[in-house]
A protein has these predicted regions:
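Intrinsic disorder/low-complexity segments enriched in polar/small residues
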Residues: 10-13, 45, 59, 79-82, ...
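Short intrinsically disordered terminal tails
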Residues: 1-4, 76, 80-93
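General helical secondary-structure elements
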Residues: 2, 20, 26, 47, ...
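N-terminal acidic leader/helix
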Residues: 1-34
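Intrinsic disorder/low-complexity signature
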Residues: 5, 23, 29, 45-46, ...
Length: 93
């Protein structure tokens, strides 16, 4: 069973790209808070956050691409209504 992502056992779960976009927004907010701090620690944290943001943006692009592939090949997901997965097996109990 998934903790956050939508599945046949968790129809109220989230789409991966939605979680990644939310996480990216949170990190951008955190960056805004520390942007004026010029201490070495803050500068390093900001540099780390910028790298993380790049990786998150790449992950969002990949997640959106996967959704487009599945939508094009199998139609819209019915997971939110408790439908079966479009690929793979159903979740084990």
């Amino acid at each position: 069973m998934t903790h956050f992502l939508r599945s046949d056992k968790k129809p109220e779960g989230h789409k991966l790209e939605d979680l990644l976009v939310q996480l990216r927004a949170d990190i951008i907010h955190r960056c805004d808070v520390i942007a004026g701090d010029t201490r070495p620690e803050a500068l390093q944290v900001m540099a780390n956050n910028m790298k993380i943001l790049c990786h998150l943006s790449d992950a969002i692009t990949l997640a959106l691409d996967s959704t487009r592939i599945l939508d094009r090949s199998f139609g819209p997901s019915q997971a939110a209504q408790g439908g079966p997965p479009r690929i793979g097996k159903t979740d084990a109990a």
